[in-house]
């Protein structure tokens, strides 16, 4: 039996990963992390979606220690979430240091326990957000370290790594879940479901990708299929 664990926030990317994983694996587990995030409404959204889509199990892990250690606008109400700035340089203040290191490591421990062969995460380098822990190089390095440390070949899969946000919408549509992803996920840094606040970087990236896809579905769908190997 093929099993996978999806790092699941209830946002566009991880929900698309879950939708695909449910088609590719016999048993899919979801793991969501409560780190005291500003947009913690995503936890309830993740619960609803994991149940609705048919995950075998869904665990919400308390990692609020991260909130104490990592200073970010996503962990501190006193730090405002910035509006989207297309020319902004450097690491944005929405970056939570160590978040993906912790999430992927804990997800791998869970995968070990449930005998899953893969941990799936929705990080992406094509629409690079300025987050160093979304890079392919980082994921591969951590995967190698975790496999060595557990003496077990647990594979980190990043199905969205080389597709852009428009193509991510196409992937959801390929599996017949575009409307669900658009209306029932929570990507917004300000914790607003669906189309979100419309101002933060997460909402801007999501909206631009959707508009691009809806404007030229055949071309974007073809590009997505070529990059992912889907037919």
Curated annotation (Swiss-Prot):
Q: Known HAMAP family for this protein?
A: QueC
What GO terms describe the biological role, i.e. biological process, of this protein? queuosine biosynthetic process
Which gene is the coding source of this polypeptide chain?
queC
- What cofactor requirement does the entry state? Zn(2+)
Which keywords fit this entry according to its UniProt record?
ATP-binding, Ligase, Metal-binding, Nucleotide-binding, Queuosine biosynthesis, Zinc
Could you identify this protein by its name? Answer: 7-cyano-7-deazaguanine synthase
> Residues that bind ATP, according to the entry?
8-18
EC class = ligase
UniProt source species: Escherichia coli O139:H28 (strain E24377A / ETEC)
Fetch the CDD domains from UniProt.
QueC-like
Catalysed reactions, as listed in the record: 7-carboxy-7-deazaguanine + NH4(+) + ATP = 7-cyano-7-deazaguanine + ADP + phosphate + H2O + H(+)
Q: Name one Pfam family in it.
A: QueC
Source organism, top-level taxon: Bacteria
